[in-house]
Design a protein with these regions (language model features):
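Structural signature for solvent-exposed beta-strand/loop edge elements and short helix-capping sites
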Residues: 1-208
Length: 208
């Protein structure tokens, strides 16, 4: 069964296995909903249940999943609280797993997810989260999800982890996508640390 919201400002649609209509309260209880397409995202309701109220207002979808970029399938968020407003408008928050080259999982919380031309999300990564790209690189700042980009983009400071106790552990400023399976950080003559000091690239060796 296909359900349509005919109001032009809403105009979403989705398929349900069955639905119940409460005409006294103007409520539709839809069941067996696999996904709802909003913009370039596919939103999966928990247990396939969706509640539609007067004026096609959809109840928030708790513990839903969001496939950001349903064509390329680059990103998926889970345990989301999602508000579907129309066929091209939603906002949400949810969780995303960063899986490194050793298949270790670190979970990021995206407090902002929405669609404008593409699905976009933002997650804060504070220093106390102790987030690592890998065993060699620690990071704090923020992550951005763009559904058209294969990898998350990171804005903040990277610390190179090493055992040299005579070298200060400063954080280098980055603004780039990072492939978690193949960490390559961009360093050039304009690269600075988090205190806006120029980063010097060098090789240090020891006989120890």
């Amino acid at each position: 069964n296909e359900l349509y919201a005919v109001a032009p400002e809403v105009n979403y649609k989705f398929t349900a296995v069955n639905a119940e209509f409460d005409f006294s309260k103007n409520i539709i209880y839809a069941h067996g909903v696999r996904y709802i397409n909003v913009g370039d995202a596919a939103i999966t309701p928990r247990h396939g249940d969706v509640v539609i109220r007067k004026n096609a207002a959809m109840d928030e979808l708790q513990k839903s999943r969001i496939l950001a970029g349903r064509e390329n399938k680059f990103h998926e968020l889970y345990n989301c609280t999602t508000h579907v407003k129309s066929a091209t408008r939603f906002y949400a928050n949810g969780y995303y797993d960063y899986i490194d080259e050793m298949d270790r999982v670190q979970t990021l919380y995206f407090d902002t997810v929405y669609f404008i031309k593409e699905t976009f999300g933002e997650a804060k990564i504070p220093l106390e989260k102790d987030f690592h790209f890998s065993d060699q690189f620690a990071f704090d700042g923020r992550a951005e999800l763009h559904s058209n980009n294969q990898f998350l983009s990171y804005f903040g400071g990277v610390e190179i982890l090493h055992g040299c106790d005579t070298v200060k552990h400063a954080r280098m400023k980055i603004l780039q996508q990072v492939d978690p399976k193949n960490i390559m950080l961009q360093v050039h003559d304009r690269t600075k640390d988090m205190d806006e000091r120029k980063v010097v690239v060098a090789i240090a060796s020891s006989n120890k």
